[in-house]
Amino acid sequence: GQRQRIVIARALILEPKFIFCDEPVSALDVSIQAQILNLMQDLQEQYGLTYIFITHDLSVVKHISDEIMVMYLGCTVERCSAKTLFQQPLHPYTKGLLSAIPRPVIHESKNDDDFLTGELSSPINPKPGCRFAPRCRFASEECFHKQPILKEFVPGHLVACHRIGSDIA
């Protein structure tokens, strides 16, 4: 936690407007994570900072973010407010990520259809089409040949998926 505080202090010396944070709390226990995240939020309010937060930990994302962009193998698949993402995800990859979050409620049923399966595509030599297609249970022929573009399906909610609005939403 002390190292993170020092790095934050060093970054603030330059009086930035944007701070890029790459896994800033990943190696910390939960109580120290909370302290660092609270410090970052306090500093954000005090100095009007904008954070670009890169992390794989969705609980951290939910705590710190106003807007979230989900990426898969270097491509944006979904972008919306944090509230919308956690309440109404649209992309199958986002749904899979959210279904993998451990829940404290023992008897709550998870939707097995959202679990991520299949082989990862090569990020170095990607095949044409949607990079998530080999792992997507909704993939159509189009998904394997044509890269989807990021489109606004509802105001403020952008998704890159050929199948949104068909049988997966």
Where are these regions (language model features)?
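Gly/Ser/Thr-rich helix-start
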Residues: G1-Q2, V60, C75, E119, ...
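Charged, flexible cofactor/metal-binding loops and thiol motifs
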Residues: S81-A169
